[in-house]
Amino acid sequence: MSQMERLLERLDYIQEQILTLYEKDSVDLEDHIRLWNLLRRENAIWYVLRQEGHARVGGRAVPAMTVSEANAKFAIEMQIKLESLKASPYAAEGWSLQETTKERYLAEPSRTFKKLGQPVTLMFDNDPENLTEVVLWKWVYYITPTDEWYKARGGIDDTGIYYIDHESVKMYYVRFDMEAENFSETGTVTYRLGSALVNVPEPVTVTDSSSTRERTPKVLRPQGSRRRRNEETGEPVAPAPKRRRGAYGRRSSPKAQRRTAASPVSRGNGGSSDFTSGESDEGHRVRHRALRKKTAGVAPAEGHYLVGAKGPVNSLRCLRYKWKNKYSGDIMYLGTTFTWTESDGTERCGSGRFFCAFSNETKREKFLKSVKIPKNIGLFRAHAEKL
């Protein structure tokens, strides 16, 4: 038996075991650890096959070496994290396959395990078509640098969506000021919690995270076909994400004007503008209905028109590769994938990003109308005077 035959035989066996575990739908961490171990081995075989020059085997396309390598490394990370979680007090809770997926793990707050997500729909400028959806997780499981696991409860307030860490500090992973900065013209933000609408004190402005104010929100309840504002005292509850529309060219604070790109994301045309609720399968699933519409305001007269992409780094690399091959005639420059870091350290913040530049707004809008966006990737407009 040749080496090629042995590899293919091994690959078939591994893929059969992977399918068996998917069908088992176990809640045992040991099964999920085994699954990620199999995924690592599968990608190792794909890597070797591509290294030996095989583009297709048995009618199947062989992934690029960089893709297989990245997938294998991520599988190792997941296996190590799950083995550590299995040794923690939270192993006995029971973990579904969905709760240990790559999408759930990378959803904000990134590289944590999360349970019981609820959708929180944000509405900007009191416009029922200017919506986005984010996720509030009831429970967030994270590990410290000293390898200690903690279970944190999620919550929501006037500042944004957060979880409370083991030192009783609110760790925000969605900030309403940042959302409004990119998708609102007036700074008005309203979000739905169950059957009530909560009006964030307006206008929302960019503030330092250390100066968070605790306030009781105003609760808005719909009456008839129109939503009327009734002031009540209510304690926010946990939710998660949905759909949004952005505004371009709005006035922002000097601090906001210094930013080169926005953090919110979008994908494709949104569906119904009605508020809905329910557990989200993936964190930060966002549809940005107005991204493909030309919004009000004064567009920049000079410089470069940008489209930014945000999401899991591996998915971004695949998307960037596709754009490079398919839209090279439209895109002027295509940046590499990167992540933001804290200004006073090296800790990564949020998901990966990359930008592509267009010579004029017409080409950018044409691109946005034609491009297909994966479910776990979001897009946003940006502008730069120089590149």
UniProtKB/Swiss-Prot annotation:
<dbReference type="Pfam" id="PF00508">
    <property type="entry name" value="PPV_E2_N"/>
</dbReference>
<dbReference type="GO" id="GO:0003700">
    <property type="term" value="F:DNA-binding transcription factor activity"/>
</dbReference>
<keyword id="KW-0678">Repressor</keyword>
<dbReference type="GO" id="GO:0006351">
    <property type="term" value="P:DNA-templated transcription"/>
</dbReference>
<keyword id="KW-1048">Host nucleus</keyword>
<dbReference type="GO" id="GO:0000166">
    <property type="term" value="F:nucleotide binding"/>
</dbReference>
<keyword id="KW-0597">Phosphoprotein</keyword>
<dbReference type="GO" id="GO:0042025">
    <property type="term" value="C:host cell nucleus"/>
</dbReference>
<feature type="compositionally biased region" description="Basic residues">
    <location>
        <begin position="241"/>
        <end position="258"/>
    </location>
</feature>
<keyword id="KW-0235">DNA replication</keyword>
<dbReference type="InterPro" id="IPR033668">
    <property type="entry name" value="Reg_prot_E2"/>
</dbReference>
<dbReference type="InterPro" id="IPR042503">
    <property type="entry name" value="Regulatory_protein_E2_N_1"/>
</dbReference>
<keyword id="KW-0832">Ubl conjugation</keyword>
<comment type="subunit">
    <text>Binds DNA as homodimer. Interacts with protein E1; this interaction greatly increases E1 DNA-binding activity. Interacts with protein L1; this interaction enhances E2-dependent replication and transcription activation. Interacts with protein L2; this interaction inhibits E2 transcriptional activity but not DNA replication function E2. Interacts with protein E7; this interaction inhibits E7 oncogenic activity. Interacts with host TAF1; this interaction modulates E2-dependent transcriptional regulation. Interacts with host BRD4; this interaction mediates E2 transcriptional activation function.</text>
</comment>
<dbReference type="InterPro" id="IPR036050">
    <property type="entry name" value="Regulatory_protein_E2_N"/>
</dbReference>
<keyword id="KW-0244">Early protein</keyword>
<feature type="region of interest" description="Transactivation domain">
    <location>
        <begin position="1"/>
        <end position="205"/>
    </location>
</feature>
<dbReference type="InterPro" id="IPR000427">
    <property type="entry name" value="Papillomavirus_E2_C"/>
</dbReference>
<feature type="compositionally biased region" description="Basic residues">
    <location>
        <begin position="285"/>
        <end position="295"/>
    </location>
</feature>
<dbReference type="GO" id="GO:0003677">
    <property type="term" value="F:DNA binding"/>
</dbReference>
<feature type="region of interest" description="Disordered">
    <location>
        <begin position="204"/>
        <end position="295"/>
    </location>
</feature>
<comment type="function">
    <text>Plays a role in the initiation of viral DNA replication. A dimer of E2 interacts with a dimer of E1 in order to improve specificity of E1 DNA binding activity. Once the complex recognizes and binds DNA at specific sites, the E2 dimer is removed from DNA. E2 also regulates viral transcription through binding to the E2RE response element (5'-ACCNNNNNNGGT-3') present in multiple copies in the regulatory regions of the viral genome. Activates or represses transcription depending on E2RE's position with regards to proximal promoter elements including the TATA-box.</text>
</comment>
<feature type="region of interest" description="DNA-binding domain">
    <location>
        <begin position="303"/>
        <end position="387"/>
    </location>
</feature>
<keyword id="KW-0238">DNA-binding</keyword>
<dbReference type="InterPro" id="IPR012677">
    <property type="entry name" value="Nucleotide-bd_a/b_plait_sf"/>
</dbReference>
<keyword id="KW-0010">Activator</keyword>
<protein>
    <recommendedName>
        <fullName>Regulatory protein E2</fullName>
    </recommendedName>
</protein>
<keyword id="KW-0804">Transcription</keyword>
<comment type="similarity">
    <text>Belongs to the papillomaviridae E2 protein family.</text>
</comment>
<feature type="cross-link" description="Glycyl lysine isopeptide (Lys-Gly) (interchain with G-Cter in SUMO)">
    <location>
        <position position="310"/>
    </location>
</feature>
<dbReference type="GO" id="GO:0006275">
    <property type="term" value="P:regulation of DNA replication"/>
</dbReference>
<dbReference type="Pfam" id="PF00511">
    <property type="entry name" value="PPV_E2_C"/>
</dbReference>
<dbReference type="GO" id="GO:0006260">
    <property type="term" value="P:DNA replication"/>
</dbReference>
<dbReference type="InterPro" id="IPR035975">
    <property type="entry name" value="E2/EBNA1_C_sf"/>
</dbReference>
<keyword id="KW-1017">Isopeptide bond</keyword>
<dbReference type="InterPro" id="IPR042504">
    <property type="entry name" value="Regulatory_protein_E2_N_2"/>
</dbReference>
<keyword id="KW-0805">Transcription regulation</keyword>
<dbReference type="GO" id="GO:0039693">
    <property type="term" value="P:viral DNA genome replication"/>
</dbReference>
<dbReference type="InterPro" id="IPR001866">
    <property type="entry name" value="PPV_E2_N"/>
</dbReference>
